[in-house]
Amino acid sequence: MNANPTPAVEPVVRWSRPQGERTEDLLIVLHGYGANEDDLFGLVPHLPEHVTVAAVRAPLPLQPGSHAWFPLSQDPVTGELGSTAEPVREAVEALHAWVQAVRGDFRTVSLLGFSQGMAMATSLLRLDPEAYACTVALSGFVVDPELAEPRLRELFIRDDDVARVRPKVFWGRGQEDPIISEPRVEETHAWLNAHVDLMKIVYAGLGHAINEQELGHVREYLAHMVPRRG
């Protein structure tokens, strides 16, 4: 993989500050399947004030205002959500290229992903585990944690490095989440436990969503991991 790839298509990004007013700490926010860059922007007032947020739109249009990072299919028998390797690889490499293009403007870069956006955030972490101050992973999953797909095995060749570095990850999910299946939760938990410095919180009564309590924990976590300077 090229260490400094150039993204073929510049993504649509909603920034919390205009270019001349951006702070030195960047938080990249990645929405879930069927949403867009505005979906999580309501979190901005509840996040640490010294962080600049870049909410990125996923590249695959589903319908007006609705996008995905890669296609998802549903098993007709089990209902399990799945995906094929190549679209995942293309999406992760394109987003990684954009991050590489903008990261030089900031002192720190952190990630926040919800649902399919969590899959993307943890995938970015697997490509470059030293690059991120922390990752906030909400109500989602880790892509192919057992590296069963050859094309993804090639992409995530640094998983052993991730386990050595132990990057900081906050993983929050709802106990009543109907979208992410229990087997997917279990394999995600196993991968995170084996590879990262994990803070895990399960929220009783919460579905596939973010509640006020979780948002407070996210704010505290980011403030601790990315402290204000000066």
Show where each model-derived region lies.
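Serine-hydrolase catalytic machinery in alpha/beta-hydrolase-like enzymes
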Residues: P5-S110
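Acidic catalytic loop of the alpha/beta-hydrolase fold
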Residues: G34, D144, Q175-I180, H208-A209
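Flexible "cap/lid" loop of the alpha/beta hydrolase fold
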Residues: G65-S73, G140-K168
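Short beta-strand immediately N-terminal to the catalytic nucleophile in serine-hydrolase-like folds
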Residues: L111-G113, L138
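Gly/Ala-rich beta-loop-alpha elbow adjacent to hydrolase catalytic centers
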Residues: G113-G117, A121
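A conserved short beta-strand
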Residues: E130-V143
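Short beta-strand/loop motif that positions the catalytic acidic residue
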Residues: V165, F170-R173, D177
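C-terminal catalytic histidine-bearing segment of alpha/beta-hydrolase fold enzymes
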Residues: P183-G230
